[in-house]
Amino acid sequence: MSNHSEAYGSRDQRREKYTQGKEFEDGTLETLESIISAVEDETLSKDYQPLIVFFQRGFGAQLVQTWSYYAQVNNHGKFSKTTSLLTKTLRVLSSDTSTVTIGSGLIRLILTDYTKVLYRGLNNMRAQLTNPILRLLKQIVNFNNGQHIEELVSYFDFSLPILPRLLVPSKSELANGNSSADSSKHDSLRFTFIKFWLTLISNASPFVRKELLTENFKIMSNLFKFMNKADSDKLSEHILSVFINDILKEKSFKRTTKTKILNELAASKIHHFYYSSNKNLVKKANEFFLTFGASRDFSVAFPDNCVWFKNSVADGASHGAPITVNQVEFQIHNKLLFNTLRLFKPWEDTLQLGTLIKILENVPELVAPYSIFLTTNGNYDPKMTSYWFGITLLINKIINLKIPQFMEKVDSNIPPATSLVIENILPSLLTKSSLVKSLQFETPIIRQLACQSIVLALKKLEKVSTFYDQKGWRNEKTILLNEFHTRIPDLPIFVSTLSNSLASNKDNRILPLSISIIFNYYSKMFPNLFSINLPSSNIYTDIMQKSKISGIEFAILDNYLQFQEFNSTQTRWWNPSSGGNSLFTLLLKLASSKNASNVITTRISNLLDELTRTNVIFNISLISPVMALVNSLQGLSLQVSEIDNMEQVWKWFDETISRVVKTPYKYVDMAKEYNYISPFIMCLSEQWKYVDKSGNPEFLIKWLILFLRNMIFIGEDHIGIDKLVKNVFPEVSDHDVNIYLKLDSFEENIKKTNSSNSLISSMKSSSFFQYISALPSKNLMNISRLPVNKLDAAGILFRVQLLVEDDSVVYDNWFEATACELTGKIASYMVTDTEFPIIKVLERYINFALPKLAIEKRNALLMKKSRFMCNLIGAVCFETGHQLVEFREIIQKVVFSGENVEEYANYNELYQKEDVNAFLTSVSEYLSTSALTSLLMCSTKLESTRNILQKLFNEGKTIKISLVKNILNKAANEDPASIKEVNISLAKFFEENKVCVDASSDPMGKLSLSETTSLINSFVSSDLNYLVLKAFYRWEHFSFPSFIPSIWRIKDSPLLSIVTTAALFKHMQDKDFSAFAHETISKYGNEIAKSTYTTSKSEIFDEILNMITTYIDFYDETKRNEILKCVLSQSDHKYHAATVRYIAAHNNFTYPGVETWLHKTLLYLTKYLSERKVISNSFFELLRAMAELLKLEEVPNKLNVKIINSQLEAILGSEWIKQIKVLEYVIVLIFCVSKKSIQSQRMVQLLLSNDSYSSIMIKDNDEDSSYRKFLSTMILFSLFSIDPVVNSTPIVQEKLLTFYSGTISSNDKLILKILETIESHTATSWTNMIFSWEFIKDEEEEILEAIGDTRLITKEREGLILTLQKNMIKKSIDRYVLERPQVPELYTDSNTNNYDATTRCDLVKKYYDDTERSGVDMYDPLFLLLLIIHNKELVKMVKDDEGNVTYRYEFENFLDCKIFQFIICSLSDCHTVANISYEHLSNLASSLEKKTAQMNLEKQITSKDNERKESDSDLIKYNSIYQVLIKRILYQRQQNQDPINPLIWFSISRIVDLLGSPTAPLHEKAYRWVLSNSTIRSWDIPMVSDVMMSYNKRQQDDNKKEIDMEIYYGELSWVLTTICKGIKTDEDYKMLEKKGVFEWLLNLINMPYLKERLRELIYFIFYKVQRVADDGGLNLISRNGIVSFFEVLNNNIKSRLPQDDILNNIGTLRNENRGTLNTTLRLAQEQNGIEKLLLGYNELVKSQKRLILWTEGDSDNVVKRLRK
């Protein structure tokens, strides 16, 4: 009370103050109130002038003072009224732009000086006073669209204890609940505060909103707590809308933020709204949960890299949270969502059911635990209750979920966990006993639903089984099938259920259908276990004896006939029943009826095809002949008037099918006379004479013609059918035969067909097949209809075939367009029907395209059209992705000799070579590499050669030198332009070393003498081959000794001799080459010097000049000057790269005209870069040559400053800075001129404002992006360093911060250097601008991949947002780089006047190369260690009672974000970094001690709470072990003991992870290691010795051998990973060698059951040793015999690999067995790793004379043996 009295005075004093000011203040308030009322009352034109005058006179401040005064004297009425008046005033001031400034001033006055008045009103906790304050705050938020929200958040303390209390409803409100009147709710404190709060977070920026929601958890908790009890439906809807739109759908909020705000409490309260009577609220709640859990873009679901795996396929670990459901343990990443699902009751309403299923679909890892959770609600015994029906629907929908996308994409040798997969197929609630009870339940609906669940489970099992086959998990598939089989009822149960169903209700067809489907799937999935005994009279026999069958009966028969294949008895479907038809005929009836849909017709046709396929009934054709038969019968069914006579047809079919099945070969022999047409047609013709033809047989003739015509269209021999009709069917007139069955004059016959009354005419509208068959050729381009089945597609192919074979159809644009249009229809159809055999027609066209030599008459038109069709078929296969392998195999088999096509296989001698070339060229786009190379070996057009070479190059293929020779020979007399294009392609192969030798005796693969001689003969065939020859000389297999005997063969070729002389300059010591070179350079040097080189030879001027430049020292000064004079006079070549190189080599800038030339050349560069949109290769060459010239010592003094600056402006302000060669040139340009010459400030501004530079630094992510970023930043660094004082501005600093990534990359180090310089000149730290910190955890990496790279620093309106990534910190630990190159000093006092550009360029290039070599994928240790002290979540500022400020380290946060581990790892760094790390460790130790002491004190105070006591004890123990570890580290430093190797520090950082994982197998050992000693010993690598010794100990204990070996492999994996990642220096290598680690690793490789991953780790350890150890680990060669060890290992693996080239056989292996492919690829990968190691050791051996003698020179033989 005393404090209060001192602040506000006594009651009497306050009353006196109030009385004195009452009259004036009341008058002021009344005036304002009248002004506000007047403005609000005006409707059209509002007059704000009185209000403006009121505030201009200073009454605004008095108003606020009066308001404050009323609060002080507790005049509640006046205070409330004044508060409301302020709210109205702000509302009016916000309504017009002329008064917004006044309102802003009023708000700032309130926030800066009168926030205590706001607090006083809120603390009163009475609706009369508090509600107006809340409305005032809401108006402040709304003012001018949220203009003052940030100021409100800054000045107003949202941590006030009163704010959460405002959300606690009164007892009366709780008693009334949601049913209370809206008016009363609007007056409640909770309602008003929620409206203010929702307005605030909706209008706040995302960053402010996040801070409000996360920092004020008590407010959010109280808001959630009473949502379902006190809030009206309308308010609840508003709350949910804000949650959805402003939290869940806020793109800047990460999932961790969303889960922190919308926690389990929120979900539980919101779920209550499902039971609201307000439908809109129910929909809104459902929308919330859909967004919360099912939305792929906005949900809180964290990505799961396990799904059906127990551990991550990436690293073998499980990162999920452990949960236990009904005594079953799971590791899940979405515990919040799982607990949310437990709230749902999907059996109560479909809305919850649909939402739950969508969440499970989005988060498939929850399916298994949720399925187990359902078992906690009770058993599944059948009952006629709503719960049972609801839970059945839920289970069925769970079973029906698709295979997760993650599983579809994953490629792992480790199979999924069967226990998880089975829950996705058959949830545990569906026990065998409950299913049996359901199948035997008396109510049919229960039995049907049980069958439905089993059917869905079997369907899912089939999909998963196929999926397992695709992934190569066949062993696990067997386990899965066995597990499923034990969970479903036995087959006799289903048979019994089927019999009981028929006995109780014969008309019920649904349940028998379900059981039939079960039998069908059962027979497919468990063929060896499938055997049922049906009674003699059953539903299947009953249906087959019926005269008509329905659709559902057909479905029953369909399944029955399929599972009968696996049963002991077979159905005689071909025999007619007594008084009825055969099943074959019955199915034809059903398929051809008017009411049969296309789906039913297709399904029956497929079934009949399956039945007839094993019998000799139809010939093999393009598609199933049954479809053609059904189609003809459909035409017959359209003849309504003749339907009564259909029985004749059905009887005819019965007799036909019965006989052809029983005696098929009789009809095969009969068909011999008719070109072996189908036996069915022959039997049909045999039975024709027995068909009753009384009445009107005309309809039979119509059908017969239609059927035979259909058969011809799908591939039956039309000549044989024509002969058969004439001999057996005399009733068919010759006129009809000619029109419908003959292919001659097909186009004329179509017109007659369309005008006749045949069945074809009547079917055109219903059958696409008949439509396309009767369409005139001229209309084939205008088909709007699409094929819907195989028969339709076959009709299209037949029409195309007729066009191809019709000689009257010429090959023109119309033919190409029509063929493309029709083939496009096939391609669109194959999108849905991938099995359509389009490849079957390929051989026919190949036969047309490649007539055999024996055929004298060649049809060129038919050949050309057929080649085009082969190309179209290849295009269809390529575009659809189906049958491409078969396409290639057919072509290779026909075209080449032999079945197995190797490279350069010979053509089949049955065909003319020219025909084969033309054919292969037409389909070259779709051929395999071997076929293409064979084609290139033969004579083909240069245009095709160029295209094929480009295709091979783009696919990364290699070609043989013999192919190059062949191409050069055949191009000799071709068009020069074509030759040049081909030569450019060949040169690329040489430059990329993609040309291999055919045969070589040289162990290093050099070209032999005979091969070189032969190749030189090919080169001299044309002078235009100089491009290939130039690349040939740089080829890795080029051998100068093999070349020199042939050198004089190129003497007569000017370009070749010039190129040879220039390229082989380094071999001038050779006598023969020296003579050749002197003759060449003398001849052409004299011609240039005398200016006698004619214009006709100007095309080789550049090559001559390049040669002269190379041999410039061989000319005297006079000759050089003569050549220079000639060069300067050549206007066509003045600005060529060759000219620049010569002038640079001549290096005489005092020669008349050279300086002028230099200025003009620079101007030419500027003009070119300013005007051109595309840069040519020749200009890039010019830039490179100019860069070399500018490095010369004399050049800087000759440069014009204005030209240089204008050129820099042209480049730095354009898009050309994205070109690496341009950037390299700019760096040289900057280095070669005086610092004072460049306008650095302007250039820095140009570069930073260039969007292209921003794009380079932020968006670029290609293979050259690293170098491009470095060059562009180096330019900025150089320009900045010219005048750092002037360039050190806040704008430059802010821009650079957005480009900085905080890594040790070369460009980041340069930016950091600039930032340090700016801070030193401005004396302000950029860390003051940090507004917010973000920390991205592992679970959010998937989001980063979706939205792109997340910058370390981003600029927002509020300030800088700094984002650290946990994954990046992990990488920084694993890939910690100790030797980090420092930024070179380019502008120091020592070289201020030294403009040696060459030295600087070399320094820059060396800096980049060294940085890239060391690795850049880690945070800069110094930057990170200094930055973390600014993060309030890591280091908090604490004030004690005396006002002293201390800093507390939040150890748990250090541990969680891996920074503690990073600190330990950085102890191996340089002294500066290590000292900072030790300082952090000291502070961490101090903070831990204080926290432990505080917890002990609290423990004593709250010792009565046993649960808390126990948890506190665990936490104290948890902190204590880290205290011990830190003290050990600090003690080691105090004792000044031997330095600790980096490997040990890295091992300790990994120990930290084990200490925090109590369930880890190595946790106990890690704990013991920490407690084992008081210091860190320089030779003690944690865990290594234990694991090395443990194997022998475990083998002595036979009882626990199997269990312990699994533990051992886990420990071994940890140790190997630690060594592999931790070995960084030569000292690490020596320490491991002393401990015998390498010998132990070699012994491990011999373990038979060592996992592939562990074996790879061992290989990589030796790989790192070769590069880390100073001598490469030579002792391993001499002492451990590692070379011979790996060579034996390599030979062993080679013997297990296929003999063929693996890469060329991947497609075959994938088709045969995915498991075999995986095994083969693993072996190939292991072999590749071993060969790399052997090649590395070979280089080490050759580097030591002692080892060469020791190995007796066998190292080269090792390489030979590898290449065999």
UniProtKB/Swiss-Prot annotation:
Q: Which InterPro entries match?
A: NopRA1_C (IPR032436), Npa1_N (IPR021714), URB1 (IPR039844)
Cited Pfam families: NopRA1, Npa1
According to its UniProt entry, the protein's GO biological process terms are: maturation of 5.8S rRNA from tricistronic rRNA transcript (SSU-rRNA, 5.8S rRNA, LSU-rRNA); maturation of LSU-rRNA from tricistronic rRNA transcript (SSU-rRNA, 5.8S rRNA, LSU-rRNA); ribosomal large subunit biogenesis
* Gene Ontology terms: cellular component: nucleolus; nucleus
GO molecular function list: mRNA binding
Region described as Disordered: spans on this chain: 1-23
Classify the main location.
nucleus
Where is the protein situated, by its record's location annotation?
A: Nucleus, Nucleolus
Q: Which domain of life is it from?
A: Eukaryota
Keywords on record: Nucleus, Ribosome biogenesis, rRNA processing
Query: Where does this protein have compositionally biased stretches of type Basic and acidic residues?
Result: 9-23
Q: How does it assemble?
A: Associates with pre-60S ribosomal particles. Predominantly associated with the 27SA2 pre-rRNA. Can associate with a subset of box H/ACA and box C/D small nucleolar RNPs (snoRNPs) required for peptidyl transferase center modification and with small RNAs snR37 and snR42. Interacts with URB2. Together with DBP6, NOP8, URB2 and RSA3, forms an RNA-independent complex, which is required during early maturation of nascent 60S ribosomal subunits.
Per its database record, what is this protein's job?
Required for 60S ribosomal subunit formation and pre-rRNA processing. Required for normal accumulation of 25S and 5.8S rRNAs.
Other remarks in the entry = Present with 5890 molecules/cell in log phase SD medium.
User: What name does the UniProt record give this protein?
Assistant: Nucleolar pre-ribosomal-associated protein 1
The root-end lineage is: Eukaryota, Fungi, Dikarya, Ascomycota, Saccharomycotina
Which gene codes for it? URB1
